[in-house]
């Protein structure tokens, strides 16, 4: 009986960090499918962030950033802050219970492509002074879609 308890405790102890490590691998990994680059990361509070770059390095490139944050949607039009500078973006907020999902859409291809070039130079983007977008494998993204938001 004692061996079973020790084995069970060891299994729980070692499997929890293993599962945690498995979950972490899903963040900060770039994927590509149908000419769309996808990345998921998180805010400093642990809320998920989804970044999608459509048609990167083309004249039709655009960017969508969506993330969950605490609070209610209000009438104020939020701005997208990238590396300390405001980037022209269309803003939309969706209320989900006590939280909200902020969506930013950037349609200026030159701005989007400069962000892609910046990331491909192995630099990290900082969005909203809180969200780090890592370059990691953006030069050789995995094929497929990111995990569910």
Region annotations inferred by a language model:
Residues 2-9:
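Sec-dependent signal peptide recognition
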Residues 15-17:
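N-terminal signal peptide c-region/cleavage motif recognized by signal peptidases
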Residues 19-149:
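A generic "folded-domain core" signal
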């Amino acid at each position: 009986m004692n061996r079973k308890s020790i084995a069970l405790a060891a299994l729980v102890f070692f499997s929890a960090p293993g599962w945690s490590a498995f979950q972490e691998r899903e963040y900060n990994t770039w994927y590509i499918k149908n000419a769309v680059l996808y990345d998921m990361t998180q805010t400093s509070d642990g809320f998920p962030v989804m970044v999608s770059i459509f048609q990167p390095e083309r004249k039709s490139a655009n960017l969508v950033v969506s993330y969950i944050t605490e609070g209610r949607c209000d009438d104020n039009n939020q701005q997208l802050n990238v590396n300390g500078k405001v980037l022209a973006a269309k803003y939309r907020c969706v209320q989900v219970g006590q939280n909200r999902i902020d969506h930013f859409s950037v349609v200026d291809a030159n701005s989007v492509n400069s962000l892609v070039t910046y990331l491909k130079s192995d630099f990290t983007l900082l969005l909203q002074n809180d969200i780090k977008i890592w370059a990691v494998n953006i030069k050789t993204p995995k094929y497929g879609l990111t995990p569910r938001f």
